[in-house]
Curated annotation (Swiss-Prot):
Annotated PANTHER family: 3-ISOPROPYLMALATE DEHYDRATASE SMALL SUBUNIT, 3-ISOPROPYLMALATE DEHYDRATASE SMALL SUBUNIT 2-RELATED-RELATED
Reactions listed under catalytic activity: (2R,3S)-3-isopropylmalate = (2S)-2-isopropylmalate
Stated name of the protein: 3-isopropylmalate dehydratase small subunit
Family the entry assigns: Belongs to the LeuD family. LeuD type 1 subfamily.
Subunit structure: Heterodimer of LeuC and LeuD.
Enzyme class, first EC level, given as a word: lyase
Domain of life: Bacteria
GO cellular component assignments: 3-isopropylmalate dehydratase complex
Single biological process term from Gene Ontology: L-leucine biosynthetic process
Biological role stated in the UniProt entry: Catalyzes the isomerization between 2-isopropylmalate and 3-isopropylmalate, via the formation of 2-isopropylmaleate.
Pfam families for this protein: Aconitase_C (PF00694)
Keywords carried by this UniProt record: Amino-acid biosynthesis, Branched-chain amino acid biosynthesis, Leucine biosynthesis, Lyase
Length: 201
């Protein structure tokens, strides 16, 4: 998993609340069990005018040329609600997004994102609105998300602080998923197992 320390990238926004996982990645695309290949289906029902995904919707934000290559998504409250499918953060990450900034997230989506290297940043509704206004007013607007300082810097230089549980921050800073985190304690695990009596094995 790629470590997340500090990232500066083009920002895009979907100014809607309660964006659920069915909208992020519709159910018909969930047959794969590997993490790659989902980006093309991200927000399928909004991005395309046809079921086959061959006719882009020119009015959808992510299809606008000015947001091509965006790596930071702004959204409103309760992002990632709905079913618990882990494919949602897979699709967002495969599309090229590194961070999602919103006033609140659904709990399961929030945890799944951290476990898959996608940083969910909680800011106040007013702070998110300011970021959206700045992004909308200037083409090519970039936002910096710094996990080492837990600060977000807006396109015009305003700084906003955010919090993240230290365990989650440690995993993201070091690029550790659940397996990687376990392996990082390999020495301690080995020492513990060496002390277990053979009759208990």
């Amino acid at each position: 998993m790629q470590p997340f320390t500090s990232h500066t990238g083009l920002a895009v926004m979907i100014d809607s609340a309660n964006i659920d996982t069915d909208q992020i990645i519709p159910k018909q695309f969930l047959s794969k069990v590997t993490r790659d290949g989902f980006g093309v289906h991200l927000f399928h029902d909004w991005r395309y005018l046809d079921d086959a995904g061959e006719v882009p919707n020119p009015d959808f934000t992510l299809n606008k040329p000015r947001y091509s290559g965006a790596s930071i998504l702004l959204a409103q409250e309760n992002f990632g609600c709905g079913s618990s499918r882990e494919h949602a953060p897979w699709a967002l990450a495969d599309f090229g997004l590194r961070a999602i900034i919103a006033p609140s997230f659904a709990d399961i989506f929030y945890g799944n994102s951290i476990n898959n290297g996608l940083l969910p940043v909680k800011l106040s509704a007013n702070e998110v609105r300011q970021l959206m206004d700045e992004v909308a007013s200037e083409e090519g607007a970039q936002i910096t998300v710094d996990l080492t300082t837990c600060k977000v810097t807006s396109p015009l230089g305003a700084e906003f602080s955010f919090t993240l549980a230290e365990s989650a921050r440690h995993k993201l800073l070091n690029g550790l998923d659940a397996i990687g985190l376990t392996l990082s304690h390999g020495i301690q695990i080995g020492e513990y197992e060496s002390q277990i009596p053979s009759w208990r094995c």
